[in-house]
């Protein structure tokens, strides 16, 4: 059975090599050669990279162009292990070099402004156009800000839901927290992507705290009254961490109105 780490390598083709097989320009892609078909994929994360790989597997002749704005991709899977000090950032860092080279895929590092379905063009932010026969749109997800927590709060209270820049910030905050401090996490209301995610994070943070800051405490302020795999997590927390973790349901004081990250 393939594990999550190997799956990431398989799909994304993790490598430390340079980006010589990738391009930041879309020159020569404004038209499609006669008797050719081109699939343009917007987004080079799990969805886009897997689509590119399997399209090539099923069709050796189709031209595949993958447009991804970032030259490095950090996987959300295993980012909690980085936050808990069990892995380094390089462990979750990937690029598209191997995918491009091994499967003959053109990678364009640019931001997409729009997909012009009427004219079958992907329009880049710089105005360049990439013509397509078929288009796949897989840009991933973004964090949804709620009242009382805005983008301005991220510097002081990073959510680190999207792995990358915020991941080491949260890891450093946890590392610098005094022994006897309190780690507070707000779990979102349904629906949201990866329902077990917040509780996986709490589990790994608890592992770190038990080992390094045993006098500290974790409080989970949940915006709902039950959560995914609750019995499994609750039993594991009790067995491994005793009363280290305090989970508060929305109806019993978990509901959050606003956050003051400066005053904490």
Feature map (PLM): residue ranges:
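Glycine-rich dinucleotide-binding loop and its adjacent helix/turn
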Residues: 139-212
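N-terminal secretory signal peptides
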Residues: 1-3
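Core beta-strand elements of the Rossmann-like FAD/NAD(P) dinucleotide-binding domain
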Residues: 126-134
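Beta1-alpha1 glycine-rich phosphate/pyrophosphate-binding loop at the start
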Residues: 29-106, 189-231
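A Rossmann-like FAD-binding core segment of flavoenzymes
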Residues: 102, 106-114, 122, 130, ...
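N-terminal export signals
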Residues: 6-28
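Short, well-ordered coil/turn residues at beta-beta hairpins
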Residues: 10, 138-139
């Amino acid at each position: 059975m393939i594990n999550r780490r190997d799956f990431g390598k398989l799909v994304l083709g993790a490598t430390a090599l340079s980006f010589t097989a990738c391009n930041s320009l879309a020159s020569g892609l404004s038209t499609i050669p006669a008797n050719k078909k081109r699939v343009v994929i917007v987004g080079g994360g799990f969805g886009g990279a897997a689509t590119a790989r399997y399209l090539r597997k099923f069709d050796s002749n189709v031209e595949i162009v993958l447009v991804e704005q970032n030259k490095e991709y950090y996987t959300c899977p295993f980012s909690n292990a980085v936050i808990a000090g069990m892995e380094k950032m390089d462990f979750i860092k990937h690029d598209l070099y191997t995918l491009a080279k091994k499967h003959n895929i053109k990678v364009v590092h640019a931001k997409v402004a729009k997909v012009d379905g009427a004219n079958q063009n992907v329009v880049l932010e710089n105005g360049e156009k990439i013509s397509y026969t078929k288009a796949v749109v897989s840009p991933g997800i973004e964090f949804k800000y709620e009242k009382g927590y805005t983008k301005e709060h991220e510097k002081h209270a990073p959510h680190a839901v999207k792995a990358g820049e915020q991941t080491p910030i949260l890891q450093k905050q946890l590392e610098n927290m005094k022994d006897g401090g309190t780690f507070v996490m707000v779990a979102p209301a349904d629906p949201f992507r990866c329902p077990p995610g917040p509780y996986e994070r709490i589990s790994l943070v608890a592992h770190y705290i038990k080992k390094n800051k045993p006098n500290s405490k974790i409080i989970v302020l949940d915006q709902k009254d039950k959560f995914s795999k609750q019995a499994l997590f609750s039993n594991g927390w009790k067995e491994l961490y005793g009363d280290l973790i305090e989970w508060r349901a929305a109806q019993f004081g978990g509901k959050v109105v606003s956050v003051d990250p400066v005053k904490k």
